[in-house]
UniProtKB/Swiss-Prot annotation:
Lineage, top ranks: Eukaryota, Fungi, Dikarya, Ascomycota, Taphrinomycotina
GO terms (BP aspect): mRNA 5'-splice site recognition; mRNA cis splicing, via spliceosome; spliceosomal snRNP assembly
Protein localization: Nucleus; Cytoplasm, Cytosol
Transmembrane segments: none
Cellular component, GO annotation: catalytic step 2 spliceosome; cytosol; nucleus; pICln-Sm protein complex; post-mRNA release spliceosomal complex; precatalytic spliceosome; Prp19 complex; spliceosomal complex
Residue span(s) of domain Sm: 30-115
Protein's UniProt name: Small nuclear ribonucleoprotein Sm D2
Pfam families per record: LSM
Amino acid sequence: MADLVDKPRSELSEIELARLEEYEFSAGPLSVLQQAVKNHDQVLINCRNNKKLLARVKAFDRHSNMVLENVKEMWTEKKRTASGKKGKAINKDRFISKMFLRGDGVVLVVRIPSA
């Protein structure tokens, strides 16, 4: 496998590319998503807009684009007081049954094993 990792992708055959992609999905950072899909585990996704998503991953690709189910979106809002100062932080959330998440907004993915 090490010989495929070091070789430029333009020099690999289609079979070698498929083997390399399978290896990267099972051993690299994308293995977190692969295990979550296989075991139907929930994941906690931290997004660039500072929102968190707690969801089950149905599908994903190498760009971290994801199809999610049973999504709980969580964020914090700070209400302004009458004088214009930031007030107390309020935690908010909402439920979304199905969602497509574009991968460029993903910062961190943590798998939460089933109990």
